[in-house]
């Protein structure tokens, strides 16, 4: 079973990388600028993908049974995602490149640091012209250790729902092989997603509360597969294949 999963993972990585390569060739030969699906009235301004590795530093996020923190997995996937997107010619920015909080210095309490962290991430995204936000996270549901799979959530900005659905369509055959998941609107309680002006999608790549999935999420090859699928989905959305 493990060998089958690894073979399937490698296959989908290869397919996603091929799609990224073809998209890079197509976009390199095209004179049109990178513009978000749905147009959003942005004209020909070049689009920048802001990749947000959730949590970081003292805020480790969800924790797997073996003690592995979500923040490190988020960063690993995000750095791979950046490489794939840059290979395709897409401009990128990251909210963090190390396992640190993005908060102001000198704050005394964890609550203060978390609030500052979220405010700074939102400001970072809003300062990037013509941005699209991809926020990378891991899920956890200790009360149901069998729950697994990847799911996307979109904010209220134009184009976000179409992007979330495109990403979910790519993730389902790779991660949710037993039961496909549906993308959903982001809850009002998620500060960052509701305080950015850009179309934004939060990607929950898997459940750290599921022992088998947590083990896969820590594997470099699986992280690369997730990044490749997300990158391929973004390129498909940007090319206008899933505008509706």
Would you name each region that the model predicts?
Residues 1-244:
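Catalytic-site microenvironment of enzymes
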């Amino acid at each position: 079973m493990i060998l089958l999963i690894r073979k399937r993972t490698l296959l989908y990585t290869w397919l996603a990388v091929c799609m990224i390569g073809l998209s890079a060739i197509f976009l390199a030969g095209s004179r049109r600028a990178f513009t978000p699906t749905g147009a959003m009235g942005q004209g020909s301004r070049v689009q920048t993908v802001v990749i947000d590795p959730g949590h970081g530093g003292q805020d480790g996020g969800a924790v797997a049974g073996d003690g592995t923190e979500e923040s490190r997995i988020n960063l690993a996937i995000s750095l791979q995602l950046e490489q794939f997107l840059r290979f395709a010619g897409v401009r990128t920015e990251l909210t963090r490149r190390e396992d640190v909080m993005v908060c102001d210095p000198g704050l005394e309490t964890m609550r203060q640091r978390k609030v500052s962290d979220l405010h700074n991430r939102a400001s970072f995204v809003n300062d990037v012209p013509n941005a699209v936000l991809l926020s990378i996270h891991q899920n956890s549901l200790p009360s149901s250790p069998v729950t697994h799979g990847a799911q996307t959530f979109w904010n209220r900005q134009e184009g976000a729902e179409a992007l979330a659905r495109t990403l979910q369509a790519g993730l389902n055959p790779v991660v949710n092989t037993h039961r496909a998941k549906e993308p959903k609107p982001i809850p009002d309680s998620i500060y960052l997603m509701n305080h950015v002006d850009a179309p934004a999608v939060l990607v929950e790549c898997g459940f750290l509360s599921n022992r088998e999935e947590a083990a896969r999420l820590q594997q470099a090859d699986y992280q690369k597969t997730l990044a490749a699928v997300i990158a391929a989905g973004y390129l498909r959305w940007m090319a206008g294949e899933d505008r509706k």
